[in-house]
Amino acid sequence: MQHSSAGSEERITSSTSSPRSGHKTASSLFGLLSKRPSKVEPHPVTPESPRLQQRPVSACGQYDVSFAKCNADTSANHVNNNGSTLKSQTLPLEKSHSGLISFHRRAKPSSSKGKNHSHRHSTDAGSQSDGGADVVMRRKSPKHRSPNHNRFSHQFSLCCKAEKKPMTPPVTVRYNSIPDSNSVLRRDNLSLSWSMVDNNSGSLHSSEGSSHRPRPSSECASAPESPVASKTFFAHCSPAAASASVARSESLQNRSPIRPMAVSACRSRLRLKLYPPGQELPPLQAATEPGDIKRATTPQHMSSPNIATQPDGIEHIEEQPGVRFMSHENMTLQRQGSGSNLARQTLMAAHALNLIPADNARERSYLDGRLGSTSLLGPSELSRVLPQKEITVFVGTWNMNGHSPPKQLNDFVLPANVEHVPDIVVMGTQESTPDRFEWEVTIQETLGPSHVLFHATTLGTLHLAVYMRRDLIWYCSVPEDASMSVRTGSAFRTKGAVAISFCLFGTSMLFVTSHLTAHQQKVKERVSDVKRIINALDLPRNLPNQRHKNKDVTQNFDNVFWCGDLNFRLGEPREKLLEWIQNTKFPLPSHLPHGYMHTDQLTSVLADGAAFRGFMEANITFPPTYKYDPGSQNFDTSSKQRAPAYTDRILYKYRQMQGLVIRRQTLVPGVSTPTQPHVQCLLYDSVPSITTSDHKPVWALFRTLIRAGTDAIPLAAGLFSRDIYLEGMRRRLNNQYSGASAVCVLQ
């Protein structure tokens, strides 16, 4: 074997006929030069060669591929058909591995064409446009290639010659399977399209093939896993090595189709973006079902699977709720989800506005308390309107001190810590503004179109209004009201109480607001006022089954809510209370005892039962609500020097109702937990941001259970104050754009 020195020359001659140019420098290199030189004698291509193995024309297109042994010791020059002498090119050679790939045109009979086809050694099959040209390339020294760039170059020796028709499409060589003499090696279905192969690297594009063609036995093995990284495609291997390659091929089929490769990072990253991280891709299979989508195939790198033949994978995506990538399939799923949500909303609307059979309307019920086949206030209607059989009630009280309310009442009517608008909103005021219409419209404007003014009543400076959701007014009885003044001979009735009562389904409710006698020492007078009010209010008057009506009005209703300026004070000096307020951070923890509530007069009255028997109050966590300087957060600095007190209070009371015994789940076996209260106070707070009065508003949020009723009660039939509603909506619409400027500002 002869080794060439660093200064030796290597001649590579390539020629193909081209109609446009007879001589043109080749644009790319189709051979691989190695570091270890050896002289190679190409095997002459003749039809009589017994050792010549050729590929079928269908696999190689316009080319015939032949394989021959390379002789390391042969250094003679070879003569082509034209008589020109070509020098042998120096290629690497191993002792046990040698091979030659010879591309040539199939010989045509001399009778059909008189043209002589010359066979020349070529390293480039020619570009797609010019068809190739004659070129002689000199290389002074072997080009250095790193082991990573061509790690298999020392194991193979290649010698190629090819010829191409002018102006022909690119040649496609399918390396689907290259069988050995003893075993057949099947690889993945990959086809390589050679295009623009330059002198430095071979650019490969791959697309998937679907056919396995038989190959004649040869000494060439299949392509490695990463042909771009190694740039080596054939190797001489023994039968044992072929068997190992078959095992490696079977293991590769069980592996995920995606292989992380630095060269094909762009294609691989695009493929990975289309599937969730950590999820293996489904196996490659053609669409057999009639509903399957067939996508057009596009050439892509052989290291990444063909995306066009992959299944949609929607089933796998639907199993993962937290998919965070965006693809065509995901956006389709989102559109399908939007459609399903729309269908679900349509079904819900149809359930709310269900169709009424005509037979049900024709029926008459002979049972007491029913208007038809089903009761309007019965259990079925209650379950449809209130599936949880409970509502929320908002109760607010405020001594307005005769001043007009602020324009914004969101802090009072819709506090920030209330998540949903309550079903019933009750507002009781004392020393109210003379313009009651303005006050009612202001509340209506704040609540919005979902609520209507169900009923309102007034006595002197006392005012009580009940707002309710629009869809609940059809299930209420006719509201009733009553009032009582504790100062009978006074021209200005500032002390007393007003009340409103009604039934919602089968639950009766009573709302009372009162203004009791003032001053620190008049506790007995206030207790007397409460007793007189309870006995004077004649409610209900029109509800059935009221033959055994109690003199105590609070005993005639299921739920009672009492609010107002009750004027009960704290039994501590003013200076001590101011110091305690200044050193205390509000709101107080609800589970801790209040610092000075043990000196509160109302707390003592509730504990003794002298008044408000059976009433309860939630824990107070806010500072005293009386008395402030109007327009500020300072307590009274006038000459009267009133001590801070909790004069504005909200109390509630309920009685056990049959059919509403709801027990909680037993936590300990054999020990039952207490029943759920029919009225529960959820929130209890004040509104310090409103400073128009010397009192701070106080509000409470309750949750109460509702039971079914009968149709024998006088129905309100959708009664509400239409004038208040229309005016409130008109103002709400106008105020919506009041802060917007009429001048268009261009930026």
From Swiss-Prot:
It is an enzyme of class 3 (hydrolase). This is Inositol polyphosphate 5-phosphatase E. Its EC number is 3.1.3.36. It comes from Drosophila melanogaster (Fruit fly). SMART domains: IPPc. Pfam families: Exo_endo_phos2 (PF22669). Signal peptide: none annotated. It is found in: Cell projection, Cilium. Disruption phenotype: Viable and fertile, however flies display a decrease in extracellular sound-evoked potentials. This hearing defect is likely due to the increased levels of phosphatidylinositol 4,5-bisphosphate (PtdIns 4,5-P2) in the ciliary base that results in the abnormal localization of membrane proteins such as ktub, iav and nompC. The gene is INPP5E.
